[in-house]
């Protein structure tokens, strides 16, 4: 069973790597990597896999590759 989650990404953050859940349930992921050559996306996948306790291979970017709001399939 897989879930799709919407994530707001903050690349180049000194605060990361960190996952915060807002009052509306939206996830915000802070990563240190800049949004260059897919490095921030790879970092977000790594952070989400750790957050949800699944292997990185089970986290897939399904939408928003070049946007700050992205959709990921987990599981």
Swiss-Prot record:
**Family listed:** Belongs to the UPF0235 family.
Alphabetical list of InterPro entries matching this protein: DUF167, YggU-like_sf
Q: Pfam families per the record? A: DUF167
Q: Mind giving the lineage of the organism this protein is from? A: Bacteria, Bacillati, Actinomycetota, Actinomycetes, Mycobacteriales
Q: Which HAMAP family match?
A: UPF0235
Here the disulfide bonds are none
The record's section on SUPFAM superfamilies has: YggU-like (SSF69786)
Protein known as: UPF0235 protein Mvan_2846
């Amino acid at each position: 069973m897989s879930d799709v989650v919407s994530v707001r990404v903050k690349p180049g953050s000194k605060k990361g790597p960190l996952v915060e859940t807002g009052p509306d349930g939206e996830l915000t992921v802070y990563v240190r990597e800049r949004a260059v050559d897919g490095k921030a996306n790879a970092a977000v996948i790594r952070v989400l896999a750790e957050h949800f306790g699944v292997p990185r291979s089970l986290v897939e970017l399904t939408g928003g590759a070049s946007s700050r709001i992205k959709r990921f399939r987990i599981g």
